[in-house]
């Protein structure tokens, strides 16, 4: 995250210095006066779980840890201008994600390591309030915050696992999001690199009686996304 912020600020500063020195023309001068505009988003996500184990963890369970994995996002941007420095953004997104839960189990003879993989296909609807700085030449910084509804189309909550002992999680979630980015005004469109982090509100664990689920008291989503919007 620190590298992303440093790089973005460096690019913005370099752009402004170049513009001041060479008198670069202002791109899209009336862009921010539009009441609404559209675009698309591509990005990568990194998700894992915040895990809280039960207080009386069974003797056969030594360790439970979450391992973050990378995924892909594709979305459609709808941006509504509220006033000069505030926008409302709605970005329906298809998100392909994967998470792993690592267990160390004791069978009275050996310690066994097990990875339980959870693959998800999310339909996400984030609604964010975007606050923009003043525009400097062809760039401006912004921060945003909001909530996101997430529906997992690949949820295995209600399926019969046929003895495979998969970790089942609930199908939907609500998350809090906060992020930052920079708008770059190019000759024909606006390009914006953006970093967001999110935290789930719901406990997603489904206790089906297996050792993998009954050892977990709470399972909440957390992660971050690096995305690029073209508007």
Residue ranges and their predicted role:
Residues 36-42, 88-92, 123-125, 141-147, ...:
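Transmembrane beta-strands of outer-membrane beta-barrel proteins
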Residues 48, 85-88, 137, 188-191:
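Repeated loop/turn-to-beta-strand initiation elements of outer-membrane beta-barrel proteins
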Residues 52-66, 98-120, 153-169, 205-217:
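Flexible, solvent-exposed loop segments that connect beta-strands
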Residues 171-173, 181-231:
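Predominantly the C-terminal beta-signal and adjacent terminal strand-loop region
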Residues 32, 80-84, 133-137, 184-186, ...:
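Outer-membrane beta-barrel strand-turn architecture
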Residues 34-36, 68-72, 119-123, 139, ...:
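Residues that define the transmembrane beta-barrel architecture of outer-membrane proteins
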Residues 20-70, 231:
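Short glycine/proline- and aromatic-enriched beta-strand/turn motifs that initiate or cap beta-hairpins
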Residues 44-48, 94-98, 133, 147-153, ...:
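Transmembrane beta-strands of outer-membrane beta-barrel pores
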């Amino acid at each position: 995250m620190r590298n992303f912020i440093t790089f973005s600020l460096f690019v913005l500063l370099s752009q402004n210095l170049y513009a001041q020195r060479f008198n670069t023309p202002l791109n899209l001068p009336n862009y921010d006066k539009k009441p609404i505009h559209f675009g698309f988003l591509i990005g990568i996500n990194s998700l894992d779980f915040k895990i809280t184990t039960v207080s009386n963890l069974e003797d056969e369970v030594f360790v439970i840890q979450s391992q973050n994995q990378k995924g892909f996002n594709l979305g459609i941007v709808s941006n509504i201008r509220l006033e000069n420095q505030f926008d409302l953004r709605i970005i329906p997104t298809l998100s392909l994600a994967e998470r792993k839960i690592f267990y160390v189990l004791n069978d009275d003879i050996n310690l066994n390591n097990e990875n339980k993989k959870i693959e998800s296909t999310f339909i996400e609807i984030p609604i964010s309030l975007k606050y923009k700085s003043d525009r400097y030449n062809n760039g401006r910084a912004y921060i945003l915050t909001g909530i996101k509804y997430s529906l997992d189309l690949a949820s295995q909550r209600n399926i019969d696992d046929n003895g495979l002992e998969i970790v089942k999680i609930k199908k939907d979630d609500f998350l809090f999001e906060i992020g930052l980015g920079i708008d770059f005004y190019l000759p024909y469109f606006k390009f914006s690199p953006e970093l967001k982090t999110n935290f789930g509100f719901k406990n997603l664990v489904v206790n089906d009686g297996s050792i993998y689920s009954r050892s977990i008291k709470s399972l909440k989503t957390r992660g971050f996304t690096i995305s690029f919007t073209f508007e």
